[in-house]
Each structure stands twice: as C-alpha cells, then as structure tokens.
Amino acid sequence: MRVLVGGGTGFIGTALTQLLNARGHEVTLVSRKPGPGRITWDELAASGLPSCDAAVNLAGENILNPLRRWNETFQKEVIGSRLETTQLLAKAITKAPQPPKAWVLVTGVAYYQPSLTAEYDEDSPGGDFDFFSNLVTKWEAAARLPGDSTRQVVVRSGVVLGRGGGAMGHMLLPFRLGLGGPIGSGHQFFPWIHIGDLAGILTHALEANHVHGVLNGVAPSSATNAEFAQTLGAALGRRAFIPLPSAVVQAVFGRQRAIMLLEGQKVIPQRTLATGYQYSFPELGAALKEIVA
C-alpha cells in the first residue's frame, strides 16, 4: 500500500512509519518542512492528493507542552493545527480522481467526560462538555467525507507510552531519581496505550477492510494514575510516593489544561478488540518494563 501520513515526523508518526515499512508499505509524509519522502502542507493544498491507497492524519500541536502558556494564542494553534490539516486532507481526498481506500484520523479520549465511576466504550456519548471535548467533536467532523467510496476510521487515543518521546519523555527523570509519584489525588483513571499498539491499531485500521467508524486507542487493562506511578516505580526499582500537588499542575498548565492530568476516564477498547486487533502490550507492567529496559 502507498500510505500518506500527515504530521508523520513526530513520536507516533515515526513508530507508524517504521511498522508500515516493515510490513512492506510505502510511506509519504506530509510536514511543514520539505525533504526526501515528504510533501509539504502547502504542496498538498496547491497540487492535491498524491496517488495513494490510504491516508492518515496525526498532525496537532502538543497540548501539554509545559513551555507554552495556556493563552488565546496557543489555544488557536492547538485548534488550527488539528482542524486545518484535517480539513485540508479531507478536501484533497474528496477531490482526488482516485480517492484512497482508507482514511484514518487520530483524536483523543478527551471526547469522554472525566469520571471516577463511568466506563466508556466507542458508542458512549461525549464531545460537548468542555474545550477539549468540543475540540474532538469539531476535529472528527472535519474529517468526515461524503459518500462511502473511502473507508473512514477515527482512533481516539489515550496517553501514548513509549521509549524516547511522548508522555514518558517528561516523566522518566523524576521517577529514575526516586522523586516520582501520583499526580493530584492519583484516583483519576489513566487511559494509556503502548506506542507499539497505537501504531499497530492504525496499521490494522489501514489494512483490514472490515474496520470502520470509531476505535478507542487504549489498552484493554485500565489503571488509575496512582497505579501507573506505582507500576513505573516498580519497573525502575524506585519508590514512587511523592505526589505532584494539584496546585502545582494548575500553576504550570493553567486550570483548563490541568484537567487533562488531574482528571481521567475509564475507556474500554470494545470495538478495537471486536475488529480482531491483538494487543502486544495489554498489561501496564509489561509495557513499562519494555519501555524502561
């Protein structure tokens, strides 16, 4: 297959490209900077969709960048980097003389309302209660194509765990130093997925003709934030009991953004499993041991 990957130069895109190449597929990236095996977003807008069998969009400014203040400027970047790239790809697919057979978008579990008791599968309601859930609703709407000539899949991803990037890039040092612990109360759910499995689900969605609609990109075993901290500490052979106070999280990220760390959702990959995807890392302990090894 020839696969076009928007925003493919980041942590998830690199893992997906490696897996697709290993499975014999040809990958072209869409990015801001030109280079071998790439086209730019401007080229896509001007020349339309290059010939491809499938397209994926992973583009989006990192919401939890601690170096960026949560102000109106950054919020516009967060929204624009997702909606504009998705709209551009969707428009290019619609106009293509031979549209791709599959179109996959990665969004987030922020669609579901944080809760200490609720359990969410792909059919659960959401998408209308705060900044982030509304963003996911608009983002997924931007990807929708008229007709059914192209198979459409949305993967709502949890926190992506992997070596050399993503959430682990910020967390490993304090945990290695024995200074790690739960965030806030630690009671909030922590919907997670190993980078290998997120790349695996995306590849499964591209290759399997029966897959369509929403898939939850989370591991089948749920954990709270405190359980995650304890399990990561154990994988490193360190104690992990020093909590990061809610007030500190709110001071660094702003109240609205801090919700993503201080509250969480129990998300079940019901449809993902039903499509036949087999997880490489269904359990948190094994996933973290592989990452820190």
From Swiss-Prot:
GO molecular function, one term: oxidoreductase activity
Matches recorded under InterPro entries: DUF1731, Epimerase_deHydtase, NAD(P)-bd_dom_sf, SDR39U1
CDD domains in the record: SDR_a8
Expression sites (tissue/organ): Expressed in adrenal gland.
Protein family membership: Belongs to the NAD(P)-dependent epimerase/dehydratase family. SDR39U1 subfamily.
Job description of the protein: Putative NADP-dependent oxidoreductase.
Further information: Despite its name, it shares more sequence similarity with the sugar epimerase family than with the short-chain dehydrogenases/reductases (SDR) family.
Name of the protein in question: Epimerase family protein SDR39U1
